[in-house]
Amino acid sequence: MAIKIIKDKCKGCSLCVKACPFDALRIENRLAIVDEGKCTNCNACIAKCKFDAIEAAPEAEKVDLSAYKHIWVFAEQRQGKIQNVALELLGEGKKLAKDISDDTQICAVLIGDDIENLAQECFEYGAEKVYLVQDPLLKNYTTDAYTKVLKQLIDEYKPEIVLYGATHIGRDFAPRIAARCNTGLTADCTHLDVKVSKYIEFAKANTTLDTSTLDPNDPSTGIKQTRPAFGGNLMATIICPKTRPQMSTVRPGVMQKQERQAGATGEIINVKPNLTAADIRIDIKDIVKSAKEMVSLTDADIICSGGRGLGDAS
């Protein structure tokens, strides 16, 4: 929510317009108008208003952070094959879980139909628990169905952190979940930390971020999400201190898969989705695969690229 202008008190003096660093205010007919899409509730305008004509946005209802536990990875699968980025995130999530506490678990969320066999692969790449949601309506990805199902899971089990791959599915899916949970989402993260001391070490070695105000002995374990900003010219670290779950997307290939532990086991929680055909607005008639099997660039360790100047294959 944005700030509120009290019309009876506003004089149209434009002091608030000059104070706003986000260009979220303008004057029309001697009245301040708020662009809610730009307002970040920084409240810089409130301090400048001489007529007490601006009210701060009401604070959101406080969330009991202690009720949220464990790290979830959306184990994206397509046509019965888990995407590599999900396995990479299981490895990263396992590291974060150890840094939070000995009791924090790394869990995979598998959504689809007839995919129970994929749980074993999740265990072998680090998952301790798999939430398995199966239904014929979930055979192919649809925004409506997957969003409803994962939101139901989050409401029931309350994870502290949810990680998604920044694929075309993850980028469509994750923002909707975050909006419905009234929480934040950081896209295209390149580094994740929960321990302040580890974050300080990373920031000093790899960025120009100012860490002078941070205490390396701070016991808090909120996730610090680092990602490029302004076209990659700067690195920004984003936190989500007031809401849960904390959510991030990570591009394929950014994190490292842990070494596969053949035969590893864990707990499978079968979840019956509260889903009907009426919940899904998209009707998938057919899925046509490419006639020629292509190699996914997201799975490649090394990519060689060249223009016409190369001349020939040599």
Labelled PLM ranges:
Residues 1-314:
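N-terminal glycine-rich FAD/FM-binding segment characteristic of electron-transfer flavoproteins
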